[in-house]
């Protein structure tokens, strides 16, 4: 076969392949055109679906005018001055949301809770710098909040008027928009219906009056609020704690800045999530005596001395720490020369009282000497002595008694077995006597820790009513509320007025400094709210 014949044969063989390639190229071209057409159609349909969703689910007061996406743009040739109006329309469209099923369910629940409550307060907000010559009222946004006053729940309506340009073709003044509405005030709970006064009442009822949630809900039901659940109230409580926690941290720092504090601890049942049983945990209390500030502190329920030691070290505490005879304090600070322990005479007296039936002469002698020490304190109180004068009087009268008691314990106490009640009482007193003697050297120091124990009592009473904390977080939240309420009591501040005000203010203090938050603690707050300082009756 010649070369020409071979080439001819190869051409004949390639012809079918060339025809296939041409056919495939034509098919690819058609498919590409079809794909582009489909992509264009998909974009068009997607835009229409989005537009229909906005019309169907968007809030009626914020709906844009119905515009056919295929309709020619009549404003395409308008001047750049209309850019602001275009931006306004864009912002209004962006604000529209498609509400989830859960949001719609919550709105229905809120309506049911509020439907029987009267509207007793309306706050009408008008946009700033409103020129009524240029703008006309075109609508309003209404937010309904549940507020509380003793014996009544009611609705507070926040009405924000919406104003638009009278002349739709006019240009808004520089820096203004075509539609004006006052900004929404910050609320304690974002999108929540509970106002500051209701949140304050929930805290007050549980931790001041010791009323658990289920009793509160029954009370609110009698006042016209239907459908309220414990989970809802607990959710409100937790969000309120997030608001108040920065105040608590400032209070903690202020307490530990003092150079004379009293400390005590008490138990609080906390639910164990594994065993589902309440476990006895510990809540600490630290009181700045001169400043009358009270801190409750919870650290995973521990009673170890390391808890108070860690707290003191974190804030570099230096000064007197007055406490009972719990060995954890001695262990925590035995190597810290900056912390001087002062013990409590009341605890010493209690041990002697317990020994009265066993050895009356010894116990009565000790009790009589302690009684003399308290009489000296009463003399100082009646004379309204200064701290320096009190110190001098103690050096004159109290020191001889204290030294004589120490000698008595050294000589007489050794005669009795440490297992006997009188032996235990003398051992308890003697091992703490050097710490107790420190009160002689500073007129500010108290003879006992009674004021600290008084702060613990409301927690004990509450424990008998709400029984337990659900978890460690709940116990920490309890510490926050109890700290603020106890400080209010120490400064005669009306706790309802105080909580109502600070819960209202805290949303505006998200980035506040330590000094700014300090002004919201009860002892500072009362200086600008004298009407909320309660006068004591005799």
Where would I find each of the regions flagged by the language model?
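Short, flexible loop/hinge motifs at secondary-structure junctions
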Residues: 1-193, 234, 262-263, 397-398, ...
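Catalytic center-proximal scaffold of phosphoryl-transfer enzymes
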Residues: 15, 22, 127, 162-164, ...
